[in-house]
Each structure stands twice: as C-alpha cells, then as structure tokens.
C-alpha cells in the first residue's frame, strides 16, 4: 500500500472512530451531522466525501465493523474454550467484555436494529444472522445435532444475549455481574432443553407412529 493510500485509510479510520466517539446513551447515530464528525476527525467537511458517499454510508460501515468486532471476539473465545473451560461462561464473559470495551458499537447495533432506516435494519439483521450462523456451526460440530436444532438453539441464545447486553449498558459493576450469572443460567437452560428435545425426537423415531402423544 502506497503512502497516499495509507493516509487515505488513516483518515477514513479517523472518521469512523470520530462517529463512534460521539454516540452515547443519550445520542443516536441519526443525530450526528457530517460537520460534527469531520470536526472530531480533524478534517475539512468537504474532505468527508473522499471517503464516504454520505453519512448513511459511514453508518453502514460502522454497523459492519461492530458486527465483525463482536464475531471476531467470540471466535477468540471459542479458541480459549478449546484449551479448556466452560463454553457458556467463557462466551458470556467475552460478550460482556465486548460491551464494556465497545459500548457505542453495541448501542449502534441495538438502536439501528429497529430504527427508521430500512438499509440500517437490513445491515444489522445481516450481522445478527452471521452471528447466529457461526454459533450454529460451532454447536453442530460440538454437539453432533442436526442443523435445524443447532440453528434454533443459536437463534434463541443470540436473542437472549442481545437482550441482556441492552441491560448491561446501563448498570453498574455489581449489577452487571449479577446479570452475567443470570445469563449463564439462561443459556445453560436453553442448551439442556435443546439437547433434551433432540433426544426426545430421536426416541420418537424408534416408536411406532401413533403411540406417542405430542406435547
């Protein structure tokens, strides 16, 4: 990469980081202006267009980066799990670590998931589906269950994790610790339930149809 290309990438990175830094519990991406972001990044507003078509393109880039950061962190967690340790507890700790270190990235995903922009909603939905798919792949490999079961389990887990993450953004250290313990329990219940249901379906296939009452 040449010097000019490196400088351009550095400026683009500065714009993304400047936009993230201006998000907060009280301020959403929709309230940011191009001039504010450019000023925070210490560039002229007109220079913004050398890097992004408009503010929405900047926001979509931020959504993609937020999802990628989270997925990369969870991959690292799975690598740590392979060396020993509780799958669920390690994953929950890693997720809470992500929220603690990148609160605005998670806020962006939460808000734009149900925001007014169809493009942003689609981008967040895509990132969540990537997250679910990677978790389903892992569960399928580790638990040796059919894809339909691991996808359902992964979707349930991600839904609960994102809900807990939303709570974690606005609580103190002790409350977050309690929230983490509750989340570990909930995920273990889902995991046990998924395995029980899978075994139950296996047993049903070994019984003559009509002899089993569906629940």
From Swiss-Prot:
Its main location: cytoplasm. It is found in: Cytoplasm. The keyword ATP-binding does not apply. It comes from the Bacteria. InterPro entries: DesT_TetR_C, Homeodomain-like_sf, HTH_TetR, HTH_transcr_repressor_FabR, Tscrpt_reg_HTH_FabR. Pfam families: TetR_C_46, TetR_N. Keywords: Cytoplasm, DNA-binding, Fatty acid biosynthesis, Fatty acid metabolism, Lipid biosynthesis, Lipid metabolism, Repressor, Transcription, Transcription regulation. This is HTH-type transcriptional repressor FabR. It comes from Escherichia coli (strain K12 / MC4100 / BW2952). The gene is fabR.
